[in-house]
Structures are given as C-alpha cells and as structure tokens.
C-alpha cells in the first residue's frame, strides 16, 4: 500500500512558487513569501498576550527577556508542523484529527471555542479601551462598532482582502519597537537579561514564565495556520481535495520561511514590550499592571505621550487582527470537526455553519463587555482552558506529523521531532504549573473578597476600562 498521499494530475500549478523562483531581489522575495505564517505570528501578539508581556516587564524588569529566545524555536517548529499538515493533507487540522484521532477532538474543539470566545471578548474590550486613550469618548461606545466592523470584514471580505488587511495590521505591532526606544533602556542590563537565563523559585516568577509560554504557544494558532494553508491552496484554484493533497519541496520550503518570519516577528514584538515596560514601569515601581491598556496609561507620565500613544496604536492593530483569528480558528475547528464546509474564501450561503460560528463567537464576546464580568477572571479561565488542551493537542499533532498514511514522505525529520516532542513535554508541564498557579491565585483572591468586588463594581463598563477614571482612583 502506498504511503504517499495521492496527487491529482490536474492539480493547478502554484503561481507563487514560479514568482518566487523568478524574483531576484531578496527583499521583494521575502515580501512574496509572507502569508499565513506572518499573520499567525502577528495574531499571537493579541491584547491579552501584550498584557502578559507588559506584566512580565513591569514585575520583573529584564529578567524574562531570555524566555523569548527559548520560545522561538519551539513556536516555529509547532507552527511549521501545523502548516505542513495543512499543505500535504489538503485539510485543516481538525479535519485530519477527525479521521485519525476523533476521541479527543470534540472536547478539545469545545474548549477551544469557549477559550477563544472569552479571549475575543477581552480583546474587543481592549481595542475600545485603546481607542479611548486616543479619543476622549467613553470606551464602551466603541464596543459595538468595533465588533460589527470585525464581523463585516470576515463575512463580506474575500480571502485576499482579509489577508492584505491582516498584513497591514501586523505592521501596527512595530509601534512597540519604537515605544522601547522612547524608554531609553540600559543596554548592558538588557543584554544580561537576554543572554543569561534567570531562574527563581518564586511562585509569581514561575507563574509569569508559564503565562508567557501559554500565551505564545496557543491551540487556536495550530488550527488557524493549518486552515490558512488550505485557504491559500483554494485561492489558486485547488478547490478539490485531491488537487490540494501533496506538497512540493518548494511549497514546503516557502511555508517554512513564512513561518520562521512570522514567529521571529512575533517574538521580536514580545521582546520589545517586555523591554519597554521593564525599562519604565519596573524602574518606577509600577508593578500593578493587569492589562495592556494599564501599561499604556502607566507609560504616559514615565516615558512620555509618544510611548503611550505608540502602545495604544499597536494595541488597536493587534486587537483588530487577533479577534478574527480567534473567532475564525474556532469556526474552522467546529466546521472541520463536523464535516461542514468552511473557508473565508467561501460565500456565506455555501458555508452557513462556518459563518454562524464566527458571528456567534464575536457577538458573545461583544456581549461579555456589557455583563460586568471581571476580564481578568475570564482571561485566567481562557488561559487555563488553552493550557489544558495544548499538551494533548500537541501529542496528536506530533502523532499525525509522523503518520505516513497522512503525510507520506513528508513526515517529520529528526530535528523537527526533537523540538516538537520537547515542546509537547514543556507544554504538558506548563499546563500543570498553570493549573497550580491558578488555584493558588484564586484561593488568594477568595481570601480578599472585598477588593475584587469593589474593583468589579467600579467598572460598570464590563471589560472595558476608562483610563482617566482609573488614574484618578490611584
């Protein structure tokens, strides 16, 4: 029996490969390579992730900068494996798991939908709060318009339009590099924090390490990247499964470079957020940062209006990019798990269930901003769900990546297997650490009920914070 996925002889050629081969300018070639990998990497730096990076810098200065270097190969390996599964099988990750490992798929997809919806709601609130930093209008006013804009982009925009918009939104994250320069960090201390790993047996420090790991290697990115590789194939005319199955050496090579570029971009942004907040908030003793908007507000009196403005702009771009990825990956997971037609390049009338999931997840996320739910509690729950399913999902991903009936000769090599399995082990251990630190954190918060209730009752906007009000409280 042949282990190689069958390839349709009528498979349309990939025009991108021919264009890349013909392009001599390395910069233009890189621009043409960038696609799902860049978008995936940029969407990883969503407002919730930015808040985690800001917390790391504010609480521990430069002591966690080294973590970004450690996470880069892990993140790159995992996302490239997911991209390869999509390219070679011609299906999204959930579609492959449905055929080969269905038992764990459905609870994983359920947890994914819940976690993504909570995360999307928090990100919508963060976008509105960031706009409020720029415009003197209550943040709650922007919740509905932002949500409807995101829905319209996904439902009515073509795949190419969405991809183009996402690429430009990714550039907004470069604002964090500029914000770090305004912070004027101590270069020697930065180099030490980057190159010398710091290990502390401090529950808070261990907790932030686990949080950094969990916000970087997230299950929704596994589903998104595999599905986007399939979308790319469909967009060049490979609409039938047999036309998409199999992938040439050059297609995999360019997918690898795209993934590397996206993950490097993601970790550079994370690095500079930690650097900027470490050089300002940590030095000034402002360690009580619970969100990205907190960080932007706190930066203003320390690093000036320009740094705070750049942080707010980056936050808006990150949120508008991340919310569609969160709701879209949930829709891909559900649709592929149940065998429904899916795809952002497919008209809503031909894939109604797919778009219903997108719209429902966005609207529920929007509604959470009006219910007075504590956003930090919701994000903790989202992080726990992601942490719990990441390890088991990675085990399944690694099994598929070594299954010749799925990938043929494109199964993982030794290097990918080593990095992939090490990452899987680390994520499983991280999940245990996340559960422990969450239980400890919740038990401590239960011991101080008045503070939690008071802060929640003061924010009638739900998940949306009004910075001016918060600063007067302080």
Q: Language model features by range: what are they?
A:
Residues 1-48, 103, 232, 236-239, ...:
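Membrane-interface "cap" regions at the ends of multi-pass membrane proteins
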Residues 13-18, 52-55, 80-104, 129, ...:
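Flexible loop linkers connecting adjacent transmembrane helices
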Residues 28, 55-80, 94-99, 103-106, ...:
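Extracellular loop-to-transmembrane helix junctions
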Residues 41, 75-79, 104-123, 128-158, ...:
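Helix-loop-helix module between adjacent transmembrane segments
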Residues 74-88, 227-235, 264-294:
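Extracellular/periplasmic helix-exit of transmembrane alpha-helices
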Residues 103-105, 140-143, 306, 310, ...:
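Loop-to-transmembrane helix boundary motifs in multi-pass membrane proteins
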Residues 106-110, 134-156, 172-181, 350-364, ...:
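Transmembrane alpha-helical segments of multi-pass small-molecule transport proteins
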Residues 171-199, 212-231, 396-405, 431-442:
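Hydrophobic alpha-helical segments and their helix-loop junctions in multi-pass secondary transporters
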């Amino acid at each position: 029996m042949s282990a190689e996925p069958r390839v349709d002889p009528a498979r349309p050629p990939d025009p991108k490969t021919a264009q890349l081969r013909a392009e001599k300018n390395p910069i233009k070639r890189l621009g043409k390579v960038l696609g799902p990998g860049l978008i995936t990497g940029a969407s990883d730096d969503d407002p919730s992730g930015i808040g985690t990076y800001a917390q790391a810098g504010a609480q521990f200065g430069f002591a966690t900068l080294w973590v970004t270097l450690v996470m880069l190969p892990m993140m790159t390996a995992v996302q490239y494996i997911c991209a390869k599964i999509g390219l070679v099988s011609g299906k999204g990750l959930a579609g492959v798991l449905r055929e080969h490992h269905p038992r764990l798929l459905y609870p994983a997809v359920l947890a994914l939908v819940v976690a993504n919806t909570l995360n999307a709601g928090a990100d919508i609130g963060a976008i509105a709060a960031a706009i409020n930093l720029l415009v003197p209008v209550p943040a709650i006013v922007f919740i509905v318009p932002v949500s409807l804009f995101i829905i319209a982009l996904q439902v009515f925009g073509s795949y190419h339009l969405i991809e183009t918009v996402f690429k430009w939104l990714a550039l907004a994250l470069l604002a964090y590099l500029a914000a770090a320069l305004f912070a004027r960090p101590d270069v020697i201390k930065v180099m030490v924090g980057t190159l010398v790993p710091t290990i502390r047996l401090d529950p808070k420090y261990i907790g932030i390490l686990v949080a950094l790991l969990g916000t970087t290697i997230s299950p929704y990115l596994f589903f998104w990247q595999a599905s986007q590789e399939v979308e790319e194939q469909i967009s060049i005319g490979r609409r039938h499964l047999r036309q998409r199955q199999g992938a040439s050496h050059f297609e995999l090579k360019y997918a690898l470079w795209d993934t590397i570029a996206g993950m490097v971009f993601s970790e550079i942004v994370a690095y500079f957020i930690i650097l900027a907040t470490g050089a300002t908030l940590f030095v000034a003793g402002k360690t009580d940062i619970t969100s990205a908007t907190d960080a932007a507000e706190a930066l203003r009196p320390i690093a000036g209006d320009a740094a705070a403005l750049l942080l707010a702009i980056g936050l808006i771009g990150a949120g508008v990019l991340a919310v569609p990825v969160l709701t879209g990956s949930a829709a891909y997971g559900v649709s592929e798990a149940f065998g429904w037609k899916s795809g952002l390049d497919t008209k809503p009338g031909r894939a109604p269930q797919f778009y219903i999931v997108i719209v429902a997840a966005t609207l529920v996320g929007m509604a959470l901003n009006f219910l007075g739910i504590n956003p930090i509690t919701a994000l903790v729950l989202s992080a726990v769900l992601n942490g719990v399913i990441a390890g088991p999902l990675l085990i399944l991903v690694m099994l598929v990546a070594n299954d010749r009936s799925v990938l043929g000769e494109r199964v993982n090599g030794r290097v990918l297997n080593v990095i992939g399995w090490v990452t899987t082990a680390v994520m499983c251990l991280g999940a245990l650490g996340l559960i422990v630190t969450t239980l400890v954190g919740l038990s401590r918060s239960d011991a101080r009920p008045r503070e939690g209730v008071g802060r929640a009752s003061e924010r009638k906007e739900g998940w949306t914070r009004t910075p001016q009000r918060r600063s007067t409280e302080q």
